[in-house]
Amino acid sequence: MAENSEGLGTVPEHERILQEIESTDTACVGPTLRSVYDDQPNAHKKFMEKLDACIRNHDKEIEKMCNFHHQGFVDAITELLKVRTDAEKLKVQVTDTNRRFQDAGKEVIIQTEDIIRCRIQQRNITTVVENLQYAFPVLEMYSKLKEQMTAKRYYSALKTMEQLENVYFPRVSQYRFCQLMIENLPKLREDIKEISMSDLKDFLESIRKHSDKIGETAMKQAQQQKTFSVALQKQNNVKFGKNMYINDRIPEERKENELKQGFEEEDENEEEILTVQDLVDFSPVYRCLHIYSVLGDEETFENYYRKQRKKQARLVLQPQSNMHETVDGYRRYFTQIVGFFVVEDHILHVTQGLVTRAYTDELWNMALSKIIAVLRAHSSYCTDPDLVLELKNLIVIFADTLQGYGFPVNRLFDLLFEIRDQYNETLLKKWAGVFRDIFEEDNYSPIPIVNEEEYKAVISKFPFQDPDFEKQSFPKKFPMSQSVPHIYIQVKEFIYASLKFSESLHRSSTEIDDMLRKSTNLLLTRTLSSCLLNLIRKPHIGLTELVQIIINTTHLEQACKYLEDFITNITNISQETVHTTRLYGLSTFKDARHAAEGEIYTKLNQKIDEFVQLADYDWTMSEPDGRASGYLMDLINFLRSIFQVFTHLPGKVAQTACMSACQHLSTSLMQMLLDSELKQISMGAVQQFNLDVIQCELFASSEPVPGFQGDTLQLAFIDLRQLLDLFMVWDWSTYLADYGQPASKYLRVNPNTALTLLEKMKDTSKKNNIFAQFRKNDRDKQKLIETVVKQLRSLVNGMSQHT
């Protein structure tokens, strides 16, 4: 059973191997057969048996197939035997056809030989014709020359002439027509020279007309390149956290004016910028240069071209008389010059020898000297700072454009520093008007604020810092008036305006910082100081206004340090940098304060004089009124109110003003007594006058301004007091006895003053006692007066002799 089962398992395997042998390539049969021997023992015998059985099966199939196709094979052989007859007939026909083709070919050979003979004859005829017609190419070339002349192809015509002379004419020189052609060529050359020169003149006229457009295009390209570079620099600086105040324009809200608008008027949407080749056809120059080169007269052409261009340069450099009136006048002037030198630079690079670098440098140096002289002269007429600024921007773009073409422009930037001084002068004049307007519009009263918003609005304009003021509740008032923040803002605007000119001057931030500080110093020390002094001296400015002006200058002086920090910030200078220039605000505002203080003293004295002029004493009264004069009480009340306003002033200023007022009042009262037009004074008038002086002394002792020590202010009236005491007490014996002694009771009474007043009283006594002169008391008093007068005169005479 085991053997049977093993045999049953082997049979399918042998069948698989047989199928694989039948279906596999012969080269791969080896491994398959090897698997038979690798199997169980005696397996190959069984396989051989299986293989024999398979072969017998295939033999049977072959036999069946042969039996099936045998009849067809017999039929095919039979058909072949039938076709043999037809094949023999076909062979006969092919042989006949070949014979007939051979016969026909003989005729073709004969005809071909005839054709060859004809070709040989034709070639011989052509050779003869060519030998006879040597002149034809000459005529054709000459005809071509005429066509080239008609088509204005003069350079080609000259080349054709060279070919005729060098190649064609020698072949037919024996013919008369050739001699005529040879004689006509020089005339044609002269015609070409004249025509090309005419084209050159037209070209020169054309570029003169197109210089504006060429220069405008070149300057626009330079402006765009500069804008791109600035934007790139800005991007880099922003990336690395740097400020870009100078080259980026200061804050965004500041308007850019300036010239980009002038160059973008024509076609704002034009994406492709035209080049000089697009604007000007240079072919006439090239043709003329080539023609003169071919003619061997290149030097004549170069000399003529350079001479004409120098003439055009002089015309371009000649400005219009009213060029300084508008920026367009300057722009046309610059674009023409740029256009001229752009053309010369193009000619320099595309031609060889027509212009040289030495020639263009010489031409540029001549032009540069003329340009600087013209700009220096015309810019001096400019009074508008905006126009001067636009001129500066034009000069910068003009210089940058030509520098891009290789022309040195350092002298132009040196000129800009001269123009910068003029620009600052125009700015100073403009800001003088601005300051005057601010002062005229100011109400010279402290700025009132009622809420936090108003407080912040003022603080945003002016750097006011006072902790005590911040603690006060609303409503409250800033100590300064409206003009202070306005002036501070305008000083910053001036710095911005000055900085505008300093941009693009190829200077370091430190130099620009120094220039800004110098310009600001001029604004403070000259313009603002002058405006303040003029304001202080105006007749309508009263004491209250002068007090406010002093307060204002104090706060402006304190703000100068913030202006210095502001300049440092916008120029991006390190705080540690030692500045060679400082702001002179301290001296400027101190001088203004001194002037205002002096004006306060003057106006206060004038006001006192106005009150004193209202005095109406009855110098002959017998008895006083018992009360002070009305004018004097009004004057004292006025002084009290004024000195209350002075509480905001620095202590020394208020004290000086108060002392000056009291001294002036004392002097005015003394002059009133000693007036030469006043001839008589009664004792009653002296007593009334004494009541007024007492009120003055009471005013002085009331300390109208704090800070006086003891009776310092009352000493202003000491001369009057001692004089009036002398006359009212009639203490002449003491005065005369103690005169000249340091401890004298009447030390401040001058003998001349006492004599003058005593004579006025003596005359009054004579007049009043004309009928009572025989009274003993009156006679004694009169004698005493006369005696005192004599002694006083002796003292006065002694003083004069001693002097």
Swiss-Prot record:
It is found in: Cytoplasm; Cytoplasm, Perinuclear region; Cell projection, Growth cone; Midbody, Midbody ring. Keywords: Cell projection, Cytoplasm, Exocytosis, Protein transport, Transport. The keyword Protein transport applies. The keyword Transferase does not apply. InterPro entries: EXOC6/Sec15, EXOC6/Sec15_C, EXOC6/Sec15_C_dom1, EXOC6_Sec15_N, EXOC6PINT-1/Sec15/Tip20_C_dom2. One of its GO terms (biological process) is Golgi to plasma membrane transport. One of its GO terms (cellular component) is exocyst. Belongs to the SEC15 family. The exocyst complex is composed of EXOC1, EXOC2, EXOC3, EXOC4, EXOC5, EXOC6, EXOC7 and EXOC8. Interacts with CNTRL. Interacts with RAB11A in a GTP-dependent manner. Component of the exocyst complex involved in the docking of exocytic vesicles with fusion sites on the plasma membrane. Together with RAB11A, RAB3IP, RAB8A, PARD3, PRKCI, ANXA2, CDC42 and DNMBP promotes transcytosis of PODXL to the apical membrane initiation sites (AMIS), apical surface formation and lumenogenesis. This is Exocyst complex component 6. The lineage of its organism: Eukaryota, Metazoa, Chordata, Craniata, Vertebrata.
